[in-house]
Amino acid sequence: MVHFVGAGPGAPDLITRRGAALLQEADCIIYAGSLVNPALLGLAKPECAVYNSAEMTLEQVLDVMRRVEAAGGTTVRLHTGDPCLYGAIREQMDALDADGIPYDDTPGVSSFCGAAAALNAEYTLPTISQTVIITRMEGRTPVPEKEKLASLAAHGATMVIFLSIGLIDKVQQALLAGGAYTTETPAAVVYKASWPEQKVVRCTVGTLAGSTRANGITKTALIVVGEFLGTRYERSKLYDPTFTTEFRKGAGQ
């Protein structure tokens, strides 16, 4: 059995209880060493075999899974954040399907949630934004033509940009090229959300690249953009005393 487990954004205590239990029971752990907090490996039993997938190819990862399965053991494939976002899990699951090896998936707290927590922010403010776009800038890995950053930026929605801090100048240019954001649109860079070395840089789209460089941030950071970072919004209808819900009648109704 292979368990794909989300490690959370960084802080060891942000892994789910299920994820922690699976780590404690695993015969083998293959973890994304470039991003997963190594403190989580302290949950492993002494005899557990541990592999750092940052040093491995897909084929090598699968070979380890097959060997453990053949020996009757269980493997935890530990991914950063939540495995469903930029986790490259589909290709692993397809290979396991072909081999008849069972697997399941335990979600984790994504770093985009960790970034919102670091900012004490709500991505979906009434009348400001009810849409969150999660994307990345094209680099060595291409993106579909219809998903170019400038095209997505044209919506003016809340945007969370992964894996792009090393292309910050191009990110800034693409955001402005979309036409919906201006140089004054609020933005922020969150470095290593929930880690002890977490850093939050608040800026605007127009100062995004310069602020990132001034703070020495070159990797392991998310870029967030949108008016949700500003001060304007309207009160939620959910807790408005005049609003009727399934559980409560509005005043005067």
Per-region residue spans from a language model:
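Class I SAM-dependent methyltransferase SAM-binding "motif I" and its flanking Rossmann-like core
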Residues: 84-155, 199-202
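Short secondary-structure transition/capping segments
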Residues: 43-44, 63-64, 116-120, 136-137, ...
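Class I S-adenosyl-L-methionine
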Residues: 1-109, 114
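Short secondary-structure boundary/capping segments
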Residues: 20, 42, 67, 124-125, ...
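A contiguous loop/helix-start segment that scaffolds small-molecule binding in enzyme catalytic cores
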Residues: 2, 60, 71-75, 131, ...
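Structural recognition of alpha->loop->beta junctions
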Residues: 26-27, 95-102, 126, 208-217
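A generic local structural motif
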Residues: 13-18, 37-38, 62-63, 120-121, ...
